[in-house]
């Protein structure tokens, strides 16, 4: 049941929040409330227009699960909406408070509780930064299966709640492929209840924007660490680069963490990389993370497709230099494009797994939108199926034209996860019934992130 929700104008409630977590962890000034009510929806001009005036009444940063529980209880008692926020790196307004209320910052709940090298699992609080988990895991010979390009700032809870996949998805799949072993979830009730979700039960909170409960602890699967080296290959045309990337994706002789394909002039937008090597603006570039010692052989394979290795970095420099190639992959590709031209935005597209169909889809769309569409492809495994996942860059010509392009993608058989809506149920990746059932049982008043589902 959803009831009419109230703005936080109750000074007694704010006083109780201050007494609970301390003055410095409660934000009521306009600037802070705006900052913590904004995520990376600015990648979308549609969302920017729709969400820019959505601001919380108060922002609170609990320092313990007990404090979090008491905040939630107070909110329910006062019938106030609660929006949980990680680092605010989501792109669809996942952590934007559509109906004001309280934004809860999870950044202080940032403890790696356990890291077991035998079971290859980590127990973490939701505010743990993914980069911190990755670095700690690598010290013990393990690594995170997949992570977003925002890994140095994004929280694990935010990634699980609003993400998909990323670096590593070419070998380990996405969030749905066993990365989340279990999680502890708190309900939004006067007396919050706790549930431990395992196996298929975790589907109710993966990519659910927090509407089906508040994660307080996660158990994450890890994989054996690999010494990764990085390389950039250049190709004369997009088709050759796509043929190479697809072949490399399927070639089990090579271990890959990243295969990112960018048609020209996208790679020219990557300023830190171009400070080391001036990339040819007319070439299609493929960014790779490969197991130590494999760059030479992969470069040989690339020659069969007209490709040349133009830059490489050894494994002992991985994550230890000013940038990594992952800083130019996934939606960081879009970020660098927007820095070069603020008129750019993007789409999220799942192309056909069968190569000839995939290539025909790309060719058709490029013919329809030769001046408006720049292809950016990442290769991922979804379950056991290789899927070219596109984040094509789009020259924004207005909302009507944007949705004409989306219609054209879908007419070509390309599945679009629309990044220009905040509605969870508009995303084909959402889990449907498990999320709805989780919301009914753990968010009975509809106070958690209202308006998203």
Which role does the model predict for each range below?
Residues 67-70, 132, 238-244, 293-301, ...:
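Short, conserved charged micro-motifs
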Residues 111-115, 124-126, 130-253:
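FAD-binding subdomain of flavoenzyme oxidoreductases
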Residues 63, 233-237, 287-293, 348-354, ...:
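Short beta-strand-to-loop capping motifs
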Residues 235-237, 248, 255-257, 265-313:
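A conserved active-site cap/scaffold subdomain adjacent to cofactor or substrate pockets
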Residues 1-73, 89-120, 264-275, 316, ...:
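N-terminal flexible segment immediately upstream of the FAD-binding catalytic core
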Residues 3-4, 85-87, 95-101, 107, ...:
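Conserved glycine-rich FAD pyrophosphate-binding loop
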Residues 26-30, 61-62, 82-86, 93, ...:
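General beta-strand structural signal in soluble alpha/beta enzymes
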Residues 13-17, 75, 244-250, 294-308, ...:
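Short amphipathic alpha-helices in soluble, non-transmembrane regions
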């Amino acid at each position: 049941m959803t009831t009419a929700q109230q703005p936080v104008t109750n000074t007694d409630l704010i006083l109780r929040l201050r007494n609970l977590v301390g003055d410095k962890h409660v934000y009521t000034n306009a600037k802070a409330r705006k900052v913590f009510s904004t995520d990376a929806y600015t990648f979308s001009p549609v969302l920017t227009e729709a969400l820019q005036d959505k601001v919380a009444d108060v922002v609170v940063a609990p320092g313990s699960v007990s404090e979090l529980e008491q905040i939630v209880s107070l909110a329910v008692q006062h019938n106030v909406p609660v929006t949980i926020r990680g680092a605010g790196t989501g792109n669809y307004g996942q952590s934007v408070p559509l109906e004001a209320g309280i934004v809860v910052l999870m950044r202080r709940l940032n403890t790696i509780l356990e890291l077991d090298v035998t079971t290859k699992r980590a127990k973490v609080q939701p505010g743990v930064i993914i980069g911190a988990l990755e670095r700690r895991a690598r010290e013990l010979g393990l690594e995170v299966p997949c992570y977003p390009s925002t890994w140095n700032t994004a929280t694990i809870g935010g990634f699980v709640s609003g993400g998909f996949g990323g670096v590593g998805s070419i070998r380990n799949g996405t969030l749905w492929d066993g990365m989340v072993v279990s999680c502890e979830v708190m309900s939004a009730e006067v007396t919050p209840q706790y549930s431990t979700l395992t196996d298929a039960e975790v589907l109710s909170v993966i990519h659910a924007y927090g509407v089906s409960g508040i994660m307080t602890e996660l158990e994450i699967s890890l994989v054996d660490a690999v010494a990764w080296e990085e390389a950039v290959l250049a190709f004369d045309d997009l088709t050759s680069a796509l043929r190479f990337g697809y072949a490399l994706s399927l070639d089990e002789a090579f271990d890959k963490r990243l295969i990112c394909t960018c048609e020209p002039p996208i790679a020219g937008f990557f300023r830190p990389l171009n400070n080391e090597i001036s990339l040819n603006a007319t070439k299609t570039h493929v960014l790779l993370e490969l197991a130590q010692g494999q760059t030479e052989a992969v470069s040989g394979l690339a020659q069969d497709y007209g490709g040349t290795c133009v830059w490489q970095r050894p494994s002992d420099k991985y994550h230890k230099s000013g940038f990594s190639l992952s800083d130019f992959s996934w939606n960081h590709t879009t970020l660098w494009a927007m820095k070069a031209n603020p008129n750019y935005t993007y789409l999220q597209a799942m192309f056909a797994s069968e190569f000839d169909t995939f290539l025909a889809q790309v060719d058709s769309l490029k013919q329809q939108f030769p001046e408006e569409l720049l292809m950016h492809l990442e290769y991922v495994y979804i379950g056991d199926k290789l899927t070219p996942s596109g984040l094509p860059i789009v020259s924004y010509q207005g909302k009507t034209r944007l949705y004409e392009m989306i219609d054209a993608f879908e007419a070509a058989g390309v599945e679009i996860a629309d990044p220009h809506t905040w509605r969870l149920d508009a995303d084909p990746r959402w889990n449907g019934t498990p999320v709805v059932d989780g919301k009914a049982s753990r968010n009975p008043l509809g106070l958690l992130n209202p308006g998203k589902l």
